[in-house]
Amino acid sequence: MGFKRIRKKYTDKAVRMGWMMYDWANGAYLLVITTAIFPIFYNAVTTTEGADGSVSDSVTFLGWEFINTQLYSYVLGASFLIVILASPLLAGMADYLGRKLTFLKAFCYMGASGCIGLFWFDPQHLEWSMTALFLANVGAWGSLGFYNAFLPEIAPAEDHDLLSAKGYSWGFFGSIIILVLCLALIMGVGAHLTRWAFIFVGLWWAGWAQVTFRRMPVQVKDRPDGNLLWQGFRELKGVA
């Protein structure tokens, strides 16, 4: 059972540019949410000051009490663990089905939706709030695995390092632009608009990713026989 490759009607240069644009899109999350703005916001809204002037950084999650930074680390750690455990199997299934682009879209939209969901972050309802962060982080890092899997399809091996470096550069500049815009909003208008930065990042991520989705080559394959999960393990075993 072979693949049929559908090449979008773009030049190779345009296809490579489309690939690099996912760095431009995804980089906004990696800088604004994981590094620059959200950690400060999270610490501010989960720290309370008592009437006597005492400061508490304790939060309640699923009935358990945690230090706010401790819970933050646990949630991010759990999201990375899910990506580490699930990505190899999902990659095998995607290769077997010829659906890398579908998986890339799914993780992208999951991450962008989680990012937008942070707008409604509520320290009194951390179960929902931290779920949004969890989904955003799984989407961000999970999508990069499928994004990188396109590299051998759009460029020869000798161009991979250069193309990856260019993609990283695009991601860096894109993330700086959205960070400056968000900081201009927060510092120029007011800190009460910080939450809007999370919506802007989610829309930026999902919006610019459309360039990548339109330009990547598509592989389609006849519907496979047998158990899909088992076939995913077989593909993974073959790679290993």
Q: Model-predicted segments: where are they?
A:
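Conserved MFS/SLC helix-loop-helix module at the cytosolic interface between two early adjacent transmembrane helices
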Residues: 85-122
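A membrane-interface helix-boundary motif in multi-pass transporters
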Residues: 61-68, 183-203
